[in-house]
Amino acid sequence: MNILPKKSWHVRNKDNVARVRRDEARAREEEKERERRVLLAQQEARTEFLRKKARHQNWLPALEAAEAGAPGSSGPVDLFRELLEEGKAVTKGNKEYEEEKRQEKERQEKALGILTYLGQSAAEAQTQPPWYQLPPRQGGPASGPGPDERIKSRLDPLREMQKHLGKKRKHSGDSGGHSTKEKAAPEKQRPKGPPSLEQLRADRLRREAAERARAEALLARVGGTAAPEEQPEEVDERRRRYNSQFNPQLARRPRRQDPPVAP
């Protein structure tokens, strides 16, 4: 703290120490004044309360004596009796008009749902029953679906599924119709009447030629003079030989899998 003792902002400076002491003394005085005011306010409030209590206690005997001395006064004291007696001479309005006005106001409040009696439901408070309590109209024109129902039907996923199923059934029906037509076509081409002699003779000659060619091929194969049969080119990629650029005859051929025999 001995660093720069000549500065005005130094903590241990005489002027600063005196200023702090003055501030502390002023704060103590303000706190004492605040406490004195609080005590004075509490004292005044207590004094006022006791005065009112004493005044009320002094009024009770005088009021009881006045009630006992008043002739024919057995009920409570009415302070506004004179004003009521003076107001008897005042002319009153039309009772019928006031009643009609009150009924009109009550009817409007009931229509708006503002006025309801105890134990009365919301449906009873309305002048017209709600739509769900109205009976269905018999023989009238059927009203179309509302906007909410149309939106619900359009967004219904079940309706979308049924539409796609209908398209699928229609497509399968069309394909089935084509197949039945194709199957029925040969039946239409079949002659209805018995074959003629020329047709029978042509069929017989065709069969004999086929048998003769088969027999000649068998004899040529047995005698060794048959020409080598050309093997048909395999079209299925899974049954063809593996590709070999230099020795295609040595390429391994995949094993042929026969289809399973049905029992």
UniProtKB/Swiss-Prot annotation:
Modified residues (Phosphoserine): 244
Acetylation listed as a keyword: no
Region feature Disordered, mapped onto this chain: 16-37, 88-263
Segments forming a coiled coil: 16-46, 89-116
InterPro entries named among the record's database cross-references: CIR_N_dom, LENG1-like
Domain of life per record: Eukaryota
Keywords linked to the UniProt accession: Coiled coil, Phosphoprotein
Residue ranges, compositional bias (Basic and acidic residues): 88-110, 147-163, 179-190, 200-215
Name of the featured protein: Leukocyte receptor cluster member 1 homolog
Organism: Bos taurus (Bovine)
Gene: LENG1
